[in-house]
Amino acid sequence: MLDKSRLRIAMQKSGRLSKESQQLLEQCGIKINLQQQRLLAFAENMPIDIMRVRDDDIPGLVMDDVVDLGIIGENVLEEELLTRRAQGEDPRYFTLRQLDFGGCRLSIALLLDTPWTGPECLRGKRIATSYPHLLKQYLDKLDITFKSCLLNGSVEVAPRAGLADAICDLVSTGATLEANGLREAEVIYRSKACLIQRDGELSVAKQSLVDKLLIRIQGVIQARESKYIMMHAPTERLDDIISLLTGAEQPTILPLAGDQHRVAMHMVSSETLFWETMENLKALGASSILVLPIEKMME
């Protein structure tokens, strides 16, 4: 049984978000001993308990106050929200922040030889999906009537099996659609992972831990999006070089021993550095250019 004095976090046991959710918590300094068959795990260095469950159970666990936090895909969260509202409930929770993984899209897909000129082609058609409420919300806005075929897995086989005229399913790379002779026709919802919290006041100790966790998550995400850059640069081209790079702060400029015309420049850049950027730096006279990953970052 979970100790209610400890912060309770629900995450996906296996699947699309499981590995990256675990990595995020570990990069935030939470030491967790996860065992494959165990649904509960306990942090060794913080008062945090982890509940590992199916992804579509996570929103309900948060909304029903079983856990304090949940890491969940926005698509699953929105579907649960719409489901509960359709049942006359008033689901309560709030989103702490979007995360930088789990990107996908919910799309309409058709057999390769099915004509498509727009969503109007779906009028009166039978559509197989695991997300009936998101699909209905999208087509209701367009005033398009359709028939829904609810499937909780293997949605891609529905058109060839004669179960549906089209599908509405998650797409990441499109490889699964291609393997089943389908093509993506229309994106109806874009999703990433997010961190949600139950409604209601937390204890002072729990809230303090949540605040600390949010700062660490921000540091992890910012570090992923940033690079540490070192180079030797001619003093007369410093302004031009700095203008090429978006930095978290002004660069550090250090003198080079025995060279009055060049300096060492260190900076954190919040932009992805492509080869073209490095070639432009070299064209401005920079040399010994190093681009390094950042593990952790706090401003």
Swiss-Prot record:
UniProt KW Nucleotide-binding keyword: yes
Regulation of this protein's activity per its record: Feedback inhibited by histidine.
Needed cofactors: Mg(2+)
Catalytic activity: 1-(5-phospho-beta-D-ribosyl)-ATP + diphosphate = 5-phospho-alpha-D-ribose 1-diphosphate + ATP
Pathways per UniProt: Amino-acid biosynthesis; L-histidine biosynthesis; L-histidine from 5-phospho-alpha-D-ribose 1-diphosphate: step 1/9
InterPro entries reported for this sequence: ATP-PRT_HisG_long, ATP_PRibTrfase_cat, ATP_PRibTrfase_CS, ATP_PRibTrfase_HisG, HisG_C, N-reg_PII-like_a/b, N-reg_PII/ATP_PRibTrfase_C
Keywords: Amino-acid biosynthesis, ATP-binding, Cytoplasm, Glycosyltransferase, Histidine biosynthesis, Magnesium, Metal-binding, Nucleotide-binding, Transferase
GO CC annotation, single: cytoplasm
Top-rank taxon, per record: Bacteria
Leader sequence segment: none
EC number: 2.4.2.17
Protein name as it appears in the record: ATP phosphoribosyltransferase
Species of provenance: Sodalis glossinidius (strain morsitans)
Gene: hisG
